[in-house]
């Protein structure tokens, strides 16, 4: 039962029960609480809310389903909103017959949605009026529910916001799916060959898809959007607060009006009660007097004395009248003094108004002076223009004069007094006139030089400036005086208001005194009339009527006692008491008339006694009245003194608060101006640096660098860093290539030496063969000379490129340092601006925000220090690389010297062999011709290969053109994004202006609220004065004050709740940031697992021809270059089609495949820019050029280095300018022992005799000594296969005998590379 009672006491259930009276349907008016779960009442309420209610004609649909459909349609059609929260479960509502906790929670959801429909419908006023009539607790809880619906997005959202969020979610899901599809497509393409044109087109489509993918917004844009959202939320809250305050003010005004009306009614009742009390007192006094008179009438003694006392009483009354007149005169004098004070105050006000008029006049004069200054400036500009024009005219005249003064060279003899002479004379006269005018103009110009005019103008300007400065100083002083006068004016206005209130009180007092005076005069007249009547009726028969009068007096006394008891017991029955009092007055009048007749018969002594008694009673009453008046006046004076002291204290406190607020506002405005200036400077510096970086990027892109879409400056810097590191890697690879070439040449020289020794041994047997062999050797020697020369040239080029790259690295380092400084400065400035904004909005939250920002700044500083350490480490690594390059250069020079010596020795030996081979017979010439034919056939094959390579080169050109188009499109997209950024900045600025305007409006409303609060305080003061007079009114005022305190406590509680909500939002933001970082890490992990197209090398040629073709430098057709005829020897179709060695992605990601030229590298090699630029494994064979974070370094060291491709060959450089731009991966590591050995690779390994020098077949062979014959001479094809390559793979059998047929072993999964040679 308690739970049911608590459920029905819930505000939403109470509201629904109250709404049953509004609905016109009669079935709902007879509503019972047991029928709550039927749903009829809620459905009828929805019909009342929505006039366009459309009932569904479906038979199987329940009432709750129909109700929910109508609610959702109402939100969508009328309010443009969507219900986001979890809808109430209809099965629970229909199944449960009684109201449990679960069913009531579902009903709460439904009632909440119904309340939102009711408050936002056309019948809004009806529901609001009903809600305002509830208790305060229910009102507060219903208001919280309404705020949940209107302000938060947990229950209901706008359609536009909902659609935007859905679009964002679909975009994010589509972007992730596209990246996965790219990975899958790359995996599929890695398993197939990449030599055909169709596969190149597919790769272009993939690249265009990746480039066209929408980029994620930058951190600055996200920060700006978050700031805008926070500002909008604050705006909404401020609006709701302002509306709530306006409503509260209206309610308070209505309450005050009602209370004022009640106070007036109570005052009227109090006055009536006071009058009734006075009359009752007068009746009691009359009764007592009558009793006294009756007692005194018994004693007929001293009648003469009474007559005398009556005379004295008249004199006393006269004296009292004089006293009252004097009091009236004193009051009139006080009124005159107050009127004088009023006049003085009015005079002061007039003087102040005159001062204000003077100020306005001064302002007008200042405006006139500014207008005159502007006119004078315009006149000065006109004068300067005229001066410039006069100078031009003078120059033109000077030129004309100079032309006129030039003597004519052709002098022809003419006849005197002829027409020609006359014309010449006329011309001369005109020239003289012109000269005279020119002289005059010169004199004028010399008399009024431009310097004098400029000096005069400058003097005038100085005077005007001095006048302006003085006037500005005067205006500043006047402004200060005006402010002071305004403060004094406000003080005087306050004093005037107080004086007016006091005057009103004094006027009320004067009116009361006048009324009292009139009443006293009336009483005197009535007393005289009664006294006369008493004297007239005294002569009648006292003895007859004495018994009757005694009886009547006894009755009257009894009746008075009964009336006294009734008045003490029942104060509420005033009407009855008034009627009884009237009856008593009538009876008393009759009794007085009768007693008057009795007293006439009495003697004068009784009259004297009566007069004395009356005088004494009047004196006592006058003294009591005076005492009461004095007490009231003292109390009033004390209250007014307290009021004045309190007002003075309040005024002083307000003045101090104003001063402190003004100082704080000035300081904050100065800080804001400084911060804005610093921001402008930092933005300009940042823009300059970004421009420099962009220019550097353009130069790098012209030189062949590839850039992706740049979203941030940090990404741009990272791209530049990657390009520099790639360049260094390329230099390293070239160094390795040169080293390999040197080793190849040394090996060839050793082969030549062996061949020469063989020739010496077989001089007698093969003289004819040696002649052809010598020719071949001479040709090879020529080729070696050319190779040495080319090596020297390449070394020089490398040195030059190294120097230029070092300079570029230094420049980039400087720019990166400047960017880091600017970024730190911008971060600090943004943080300070945010702090200032938060301090202006909420002074209580300022300290917490400052602490949080300090922690953030410390973290940022630590991150920057870590970044600087990393950069210093990178610099050290670059220096080490430079040193190693120098050492390699010295070694190459030594090798070059050794080669020259060997070449000289070989030359001498060839000369000796020529002398010996002259005697060789001609029979072996036929054999040599056959060899020549075979070589020609090989040449034709190479020519066909060259044609194929040319075709591939054309395809590469087409691909380069497509890439250029993509770059132009990227530039256009970047421009569009920059425009959008500017627009976003403009919108932010406009919104800031709107916020400032709303703040101004808020300040105005706060000032109005303060005025209203001051009025309320004045009313409360009046109420206090009335409370002192009446205790009941004081109790009511205390209740009002307690209600006020409760409202203030609620407001403070709401502020605390708002503060907690802000903290929750900040925590949610931090959680979102962490989630974002985790997502970025996951994306980077996906990018690391991506596989690129791989290609396998073709069958290799003999060593000598391959080395010769690798070292011949041929010009490329385009700037990017393509492959030449020598590239055919690098990669074959077999190398491209080789499957991967292992099934995992980690084994493949270490080494990308190499290519024959830079264009093939762009097509086939992996896109390093697509990977994370920070991932470079330092422990790898690449010499620390690839960076990797600490968490990935250990994973790579533990695995065996395996690659699905053949090792690199000697690349061919076609031109010295583009040789440094082509990057090749280094060869595989030497003598590297893997940490984890795979058992499959070791168990199924079977070496081949002709490929591995460590085989068991070759161990049995021994080296043939001098003078001995070989047991076995290899065929020519076998020798060619031997010298084909210095790296070859050993393939396993596809199905070993030990393994079963259904095993999952791949054909090339456990291949192992063996190396031999002299590298």
Curated annotation (Swiss-Prot):
Q: Where is the Calponin-homology (CH) domain?
A: 6-118
Please give a single GO biological process term from the UniProt record: positive regulation of dendrite extension
Among Pfam families, the record links this protein to:
HOOK_N
Query: Which InterPro entries would you find in this protein's record?
Result: CH_dom, CH_dom_sf, HOOK_N
Q: Which PROSITE patterns match?
A: CH
Which Gene3D superfamilies has this protein been placed in? Calponin-like domain
Question: Where along the sequence do coiled-coil regions lie?
Answer: 141-173, 218-690, 732-1096
Question: Keyword annotations for this protein?
Answer: Cell projection, Coiled coil, Cytoplasm, Cytoskeleton
Stretches of Polar residues bias are at 204-222, 1118-1131
A Gene Ontology cellular component where this protein is annotated is: centrosome
Record keywords: Cytoplasm included? Answer: yes
* Molecular-function GO term, any one: microtubule binding
Q: Region Disordered: which residues?
A: 166-222, 1112-1236, 1289-1308
Q: What happens when the gene is disrupted?
A: Embryonic lethal with few malformed larvae that develop to the L1 stage of larval development.
What the record says about family reads: Belongs to the CCDC88 family.
Q: What does this protein do?
A: Scaffolding protein that plays a role in ciliogenesis, cilium positioning and dendrite anchoring in sensory amphid neurons including AWB, AWA, AWC, ADL and ASI, the phasmid neurons PHA and PHB and the gas sensing neurons AQR, PQR, URX and BAG. Its role in cilium positioning may be through regulation of the localization of cell adhesion proteins such as the apical junction protein ajm-1, and the ciliary scaffolding protein Rootletin/che-10. Plays a more prominent role in regulating dendrite morphogenesis in AQR than in PQR neurons. Regulates localization of hmr-1 to the distal AQR dendrite.
- Entry's free-text remark on domains: The C-terminal domain is required for localization to the cilium basal body and role in ciliogenesis.
Entry protein name:
Girdin homolog
Gene encoding it? Answer: grdn-1
């Amino acid at each position: 039962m308690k739970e049911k009672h608590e459920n029905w006491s819930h505000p939403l259930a109470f509201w629904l029960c109250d709404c049953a009276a509004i609905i016109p349907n009669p079935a709902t008016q007879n509503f019972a609480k047991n029928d709550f779960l039927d749903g009829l009442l809620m459905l009828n309420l929805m019909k009342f809310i929505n006039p366009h209610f459309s009932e569904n004609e479906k038979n199987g649909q329940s009432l709750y389903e129909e109700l929910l459909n109508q609610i959702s349609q109402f939100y969508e059609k009328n309010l443009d909103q969507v219900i986001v929260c979890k809808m109430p479960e209809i099965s629970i509502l229909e199944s449960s017959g009684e109201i449990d906790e679960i069913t009531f929670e579902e009903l709460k959801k439904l009632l909440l949605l119904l309340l939102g429909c009711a408050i936002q419908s056309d019948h809004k006023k009806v529901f609001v009026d009903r809600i305002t009539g509830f208790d305060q607790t229910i009102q507060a809880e219903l208001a919280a529910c309404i705020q949940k619906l209107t302000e938060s997005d947990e229950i209901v959202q706008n359609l536009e916001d909902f659609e935007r969020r859905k679009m964002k979610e679909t975009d994010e899901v589509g972007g992730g799916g596209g990246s996965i599809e790219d990975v899958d497509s790359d995996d599929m393409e890695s398993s197939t060959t990449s030599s055909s044109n169709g596969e190149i087109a597919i790769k272009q489509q993939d690249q265009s898809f990746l480039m066209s993918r929408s980029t994620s917004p930058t951190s600055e844009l996200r920060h700006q959007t978050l700031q805008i959202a926070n500002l909008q939320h604050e705006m909404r809250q401020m609006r709701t607060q302002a509306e709530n305050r306006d409503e509260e003010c209206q309610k308070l005004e209505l309450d005050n009006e009602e209370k004022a009306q009640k106070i007036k009614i109570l005052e009227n009742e109090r006055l009536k009660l006071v009058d009734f009390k006075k009359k009752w007192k007068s009746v009691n006094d009359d009764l007592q007097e009558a009793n006294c008179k009756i007692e005194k009438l018994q004693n007929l003694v001293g009648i003469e004395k009474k007559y005398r006392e009556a005379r004295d009483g008249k004199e006393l009354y006269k004296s009292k009248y004089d006293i009252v007149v004097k009091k009236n005169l004193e009051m009139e004098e006080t009124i005159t003094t107050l009127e004088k004070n009023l006049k003085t105050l009015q005079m002061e006000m007039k003087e102040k108004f005159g001062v204000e008029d003077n100020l306005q006049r001064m302002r007008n004069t200042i405006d006139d002076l500014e207008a005159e200054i502007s006119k004078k400036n315009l006149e000065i500009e006109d004068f300067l223009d005229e001066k410039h024009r006069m100078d031009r005219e003078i120059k033109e005249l000077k030129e004309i004069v100079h032309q006129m003064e030039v003597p004519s060279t052709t002098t022809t003899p003419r006849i005197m007094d002829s027409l020609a002479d006359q014309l010449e004379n006329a011309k001369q006269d005109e020239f003289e006139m012109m000269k005279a005018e020119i002289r005059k103009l010169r004199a004028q110009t010399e008399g009024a030089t431009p310097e004098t005019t400029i000096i005069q103008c400058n003097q005038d300007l100085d005077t005007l400036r001095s006048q302006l400065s003085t006037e500005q100083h005067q205006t500043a002083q006047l402004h200060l005086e005006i402010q002071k006068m305004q403060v004094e004016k406000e003080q005087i206005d306050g004093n005037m208001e107080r004086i007016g209130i006091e005057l009103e009180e004094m006027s009320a007092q004067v009116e009361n005194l006048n009324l009292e005076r009139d009443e006293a005069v009336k009483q005197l007249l009535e007393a005289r009339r009664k006294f006369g009547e008493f004297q007239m009726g005294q002569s009648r028969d006292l003895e007859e009527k004495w018994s009757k009068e005694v009886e009547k007096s006894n009755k009257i006394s009894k009746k008075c006692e009964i009336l006294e008891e009734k008045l003490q017991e029942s104060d509420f029955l005033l009407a009855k008491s008034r009627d009884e009092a009237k009856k008593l007055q009538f009876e008393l009048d009759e009794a007085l008339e009768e007693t008057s007749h009795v007293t006439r018969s009495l003697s004068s002594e009784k009259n004297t006694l009566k007069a004395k008694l009356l005088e004494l009673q009047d004196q006592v009453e006058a003294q009591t009245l005076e005492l009461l008046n004095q007490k009231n006046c003292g109390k009033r004076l004390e209250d007014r003194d307290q009021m004045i002291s309190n007002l003075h204290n309040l005024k002083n406190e307000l003045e101090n608060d104003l001063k402190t607020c003004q100082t704080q506002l000035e300081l904050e405005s100065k800080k804001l101006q400084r911060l804005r200036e610093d921001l402008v400077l930092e933005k300009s510096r940042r823009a300059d640096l970004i421009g420099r970086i962009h220019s550097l990027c353009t130069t790098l892109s012209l030189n062949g660098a590839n850039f992706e879409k740049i979203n941030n400056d940090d990404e741009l810097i990272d791209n530049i860093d990657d390009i520099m590191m790639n360049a260094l890697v390329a230099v390293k690879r070239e160094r390795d290539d040169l080293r390999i070439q040197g080793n190849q040449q040394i090996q060839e020289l050793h082969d030549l030496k062996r061949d020469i020794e063989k020739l010496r041994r077989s001089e007698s047997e093969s003289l004819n063969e040696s002649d052809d062999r010598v020719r071949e050797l001479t040709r090879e020697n020529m080729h070696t000379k050319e190779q040495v020369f080319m090596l020297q040239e390449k070394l020089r080029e490398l040195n030059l490129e190294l120097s230029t790259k070092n300079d570029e690295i230094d420049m980039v380092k400087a720019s990166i340092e400047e960017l880091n400084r600017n970024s730190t400065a911008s971060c600090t400035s943004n943080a300070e601006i945010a702090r200032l904004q938060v301090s202006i909005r909420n002074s209580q939250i300022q300290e917490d925000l400052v602490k949080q920002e300090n922690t953030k700044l410390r973290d940022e500083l630590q991150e920057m220090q870590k970044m600087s350490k990393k950069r210093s480490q990178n610099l050290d690594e670059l220096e080490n690389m430079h040193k190693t390059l120098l050492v390699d250069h010295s070694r190459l020079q030594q090798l070059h010297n050794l080669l020259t010596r060997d070449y000289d020795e070989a030359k001498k030996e060839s000369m000796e062999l020529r002398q010996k081979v002259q005697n060789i017979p001609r029979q072996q010439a036929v054999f040599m011709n056959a060899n020549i034919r075979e070589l020609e056939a090989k040449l034709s094959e190479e020519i066909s290969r060259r044609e194929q390579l040319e075709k591939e080169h054309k395809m590469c050109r087409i691909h380069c053109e497509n890439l250029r188009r993509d770059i132009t499109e990227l530039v256009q997209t970047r421009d569009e994004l920059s425009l959008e950024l500017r627009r976003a900045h403009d919108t932010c600025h406009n919104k800031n202006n709107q916020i400032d305007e709303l703040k101004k409006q808020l300040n105005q409303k706060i000032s109005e609220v303060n005025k209203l609060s001051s009025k309320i305080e004045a009313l409360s003061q009046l109420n206090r004065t009335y409370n002192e007079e009446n205790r009941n009114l004081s109790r009511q005022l205390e209740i009002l004050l307690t209600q006020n305190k409760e409202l203030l406590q609620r407001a403070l509680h709401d502020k605390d709740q708002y503060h907690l909500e802000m903290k929750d939002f900040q925590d949610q933001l931090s959680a979102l940031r962490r989630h974002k970082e985790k997502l970025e890490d996951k994306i980077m992990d996906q990018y690391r697992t991506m596989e690129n197209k791989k290609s396998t090398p073709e069958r290799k040629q003999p060593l000598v021809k391959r080395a010769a073709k690798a070292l011949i430098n041929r010009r490329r057709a385009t700037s990017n270059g393509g492959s030449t005829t020598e590239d055919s020897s690098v990669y074959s179709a077999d190398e491209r089609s080789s499957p991967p060695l292992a099934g995992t992605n980690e084994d493949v990601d270490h080494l990308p495949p190499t290519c024959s030229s830079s264009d093939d590298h762009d097509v086939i090699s992996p896109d390093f820019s697509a990977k994370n630029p920070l991932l470079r494994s330092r422990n790898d064979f690449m010499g620390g050029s690839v960076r990797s974070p600490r968490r990935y370094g250990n994973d790579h060291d533990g695995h065996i280095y395996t690659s699905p491709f053949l090792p690199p060959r000697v690349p061919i450089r076609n031109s010295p300018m583009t040789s440094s731009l082509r990057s090749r991966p280094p060869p595989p590591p030497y003598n590297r022992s893997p940490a984890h050995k795979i058992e499959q690779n070791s168990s199924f390994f079977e070496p081949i005799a002709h490929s591995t020098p460590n085989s068991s077949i070759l161990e049995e062979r021994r080296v043939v000594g001098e003078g001995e014959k070989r047991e076995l001479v290899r065929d020519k094809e076998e020798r060619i296969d031997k010298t084909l390559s210095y790296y070859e793979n050993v393939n396993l059998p596809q199905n070993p005998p030990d393994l079963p047929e259904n095993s999952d072993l791949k054909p090339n999964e456990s291949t192992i590379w063996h190396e031999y040679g002299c590298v």
